[in-house]
Curated annotation (Swiss-Prot):
The gene is purU. This is Formyltetrahydrofolate deformylase. It comes from Corynebacterium sp. (strain P-1). The active site is at 230. The lineage of its organism: Bacteria, Bacillati, Actinomycetota, Actinomycetes, Mycobacteriales. The keyword Isomerase does not apply. CDD domains: ACT_F4HF-DF, FMT_core_Formyl-FH4-Hydrolase_C. It catalyses: (6R)-10-formyltetrahydrofolate + H2O = (6S)-5,6,7,8-tetrahydrofolate + formate + H(+). Catalyzes the hydrolysis of 10-formyltetrahydrofolate (formyl-FH4) to formate and tetrahydrofolate (FH4). Belongs to the PurU family.
Amino acid sequence: MSEQVRHVLTLQCPEGIGIVHAVTGFLVRHQRTIVELKQYDDMSAGRLFLRVDFAGDSAPDLLDALRSEFSEVAAKFDMDWQLRERGQKTKVLIMVSKFEHCLQDLLFRMHSGDLPIEVVGVASNHPDHRSLVEWYGIGFHHIPISKDTKPRAEAALLELIDQTGAELVVLARYMQVLSDHLASELTGKTINIHHSFLPSFKGAKPYHQAWERGVKTVGATAHYVNSELDEGPIIAQQVVEVDHTYGPQDLVAAGRDSECKALSNAVRWHCEGRVFLYGNRTVVLR
């Protein structure tokens, strides 16, 4: 028996009759077995979102052959699509400032095999976490940033992304506002964790804002970056119940776990091809 290999096909396109039939028919013709199929038909937008995890016998140049032949199906239905091997690790560059809990969580999950990622570097505007990062055998890049040096620092970040081949950038409590230019360059391939349940309490010190309002839940939001501060399409959110006895620092401590969980979920779903961007929204086929 030949070795079995698995692939994941993701697509979105205008809704219409026969799309799913065309996709499954393609898989049947190539003797592929569907392991998981998830779809969402957004009736209001008139758009279909589809993710198929399928398996079959290995063959030389199989992925290229599948891509070449599926392109004909895709063209017929005006599909925006991607086909890749399942389990292929996504190259990730992490950016961080002073707070290290999200960084530690991502590095541990990578090391334990919980996340399908390869961290190709960590960049920070502070030198604090060099020893932690290098313990994992990962390159640490200290890129100081100030108002005067921001254009030069952001150019260095873009160069680092290019040099490392990073496919995804993760802002793991990176406490610098990206310029419109950098945010535009990274649109759709950068995930930020905001320590608030957006759209509430944007900007700095959201836990202090939450305490002033007497909230009964605090949370965290992982979202794609765009040119608007904390306004990018939301991927994942987590909440923690609190009460009137929690002070601002208690809320900060309570929120850290939710930040780690929301960010790791967002990274996982992105790397598994479960997140679809459409306008300022996402569809997540979990």
